[in-house]
Amino acid sequence: YAQRGDAAQGSEQLYDTLMTSSDDEIDVLYPLIAEQIEYSKDYTWIIFYINKKAKFQDGKNITAQDVVFTFNTFMTQGVPQFKSYYKNVAHVEALDSHKVKFTLKKSQLDLLHSLASLAVLPKHYWETRDFSEPTTQIPLGSSGFTIDSFKMGQYVVVKRLKDYWAKDLAVNKGRHNFDFIRYDYYKDEIV
């Protein structure tokens, strides 16, 4: 998500999104961190209701403030594509600890879908770190996987967490069936 450096292979598995898609259904989203949504008929705003059971890997609850922090961090310190893609978002606000509202400058249905796919970062972890700088520290995530081990430029191993908060959600049935996944790097990118 940051501008400098290349993200580690498998790092996209470290963070859950507000909602998740199905690999066999086009444009269908299912609740994950957000257990419910509400949106205007003209597609100019959307409210995500955060599942009160949603937790980061340190056991702290995922809140609307984390979503606001994530969006603002991506817009100010993330890759330039975020600014371009989300330029139609007028503002984002936490209505309470479990409701977050995105208001758009104009109607844009596909942007509502994209916002639902937003990975959520833990504010309490990232607010004291420089998000724009590459790191070799294992980040705190929200998904069912964390980095188990790595060797820079050679491999990354992610491991499944047994106490993942969303392991029993219907959307996760049949997913996350491997205890470990290893990503190897090769000097030749064509390999």
Pin down the residues of each PLM region.
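Aromatic- and charge-enriched surface segment that lines or borders ligand/interaction sites
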Residues: 35-80, 95, 101
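A structural "hinge/loop" feature
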Residues: 1-9, 33, 60, 82, ...
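N-terminal lobe/hinge region of extracytoplasmic solute-binding protein
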Residues: 1-41, 72, 140
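Surface-exposed binding/hinge segments that line
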Residues: 83-126, 146-151
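Short, well-ordered beta-strand elements
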Residues: 1, 35, 45-48, 67-70, ...
